[in-house]
Amino acid sequence: MASGREIKSKIKSVQNTRKVTRALEMVSASKIRKAQEQMKISRPYAQAMKQMIGHLAQANTDYLHPFLIAHKQVKRIGYIVISSDRGLAGGLNNNLFRKILGEMRQWQDKGVEVDIVTIGQKASVFFRRIKVNILGSVTHLGDTPRLEQLIGVIKVMLDAYTEEKLDRVYLVYNRFINTMVQKASFDQLLPLLAAKDKVAHHDWDYLYEPDAATVLEHVMTRYIESLVYQAMLENIASEHAARMVAMKAASDNANKLIGTLQLVYNKARQAAITQEISEIVGGAAAV
């Protein structure tokens, strides 16, 4: 059995760790509220854009934007992967990466090659380590990212699709469901899909000023950017929720461990006292 001093040292070490996990839990609880507000503010715009683009995909026009055209064969696909910059978020990032690898293997089994761009330090490090072809990367965007910071990596994928270097583009991120649930999501970005709402079967006629090509070029690009930005906000909220839950679990485990160590310490102290008493009694009897 370890000595009382060693056990006391272990208890002190676990208590110090508990202070850190409690602090991180409280910080994440505070940040998640702000992240949820940002996410909710952005959602209506993204949803309205999605509905409008779905209608444009069915509109009667002489000009068909490249983002609406499905390539005949799928030989190469691209993923925009969003992760966190920091760890201590439970299995949030690893679960996402595991699902991406499963999807990638399915495509590769069909002879389809895969390119990615990464948003977030964890994704960048992970995919560089396993030697996936990375077309672009951006990291350390913080808790309040700006759209301008994402435009570069988004443009890489849009240009590759327009030039037919990629045949499909997917957006991969953690969708925020609630504080306890975050879901790995795979959304098809390109080619754009037609609307599936109750008016999807209508034929839509739009008047474009100055012309269809100019309007659609701007609208389509803004739409893709809004989807990626919304996914980024969802992932940030998911990160803080996962970290809060993980740190609470760590704090609870620390409490249990401290309780167990305290019992061991009490038993060791009791055994030491009992031994001292026995030695005193034995010495007195010998006299």
UniProtKB/Swiss-Prot annotation:
Location(s) in or outside the cell: Cell inner membrane
GO MF term set: ATP binding; proton-transporting ATP synthase activity, rotational mechanism
Annotated keywords: ATP synthesis, Cell inner membrane, Cell membrane, CF(1), Hydrogen ion transport, Ion transport, Membrane, Transport
One Pfam family recorded for the sequence: ATP-synt
Domain of life: Bacteria
Membrane topology listed for this record: Peripheral membrane protein
Cellular-component GO terms for this entry: plasma membrane; proton-transporting ATP synthase complex
Main location: membrane
Biological process annotations from GO: proton motive force-driven plasma membrane ATP synthesis
Database matches in Gene3D superfamilies: 3.40.1380.10, ATP synthase, gamma subunit, helix hairpin domain
SUPFAM superfamilies to which the protein is assigned, alphabetical: ATP synthase (F1-ATPase), gamma subunit
Coiled-coil spans in chain: none
Described purpose of this protein according to its UniProt entry: Produces ATP from ADP in the presence of a proton gradient across the membrane. The gamma chain is believed to be important in regulating ATPase activity and the flow of protons through the CF(0) complex.
Matches recorded under HAMAP family: ATP_synth_gamma_bact (MF_00815)
Family: Belongs to the ATPase gamma chain family.
Quaternary structure and interacting proteins, as annotated: F-type ATPases have 2 components, CF(1) - the catalytic core - and CF(0) - the membrane proton channel. CF(1) has five subunits: alpha(3), beta(3), gamma(1), delta(1), epsilon(1). CF(0) has three main subunits: a, b and c.
Record-given protein name: ATP synthase gamma chain
Species in which this protein is naturally found: Xylella fastidiosa (strain M12)
Gene coding for it: atpG
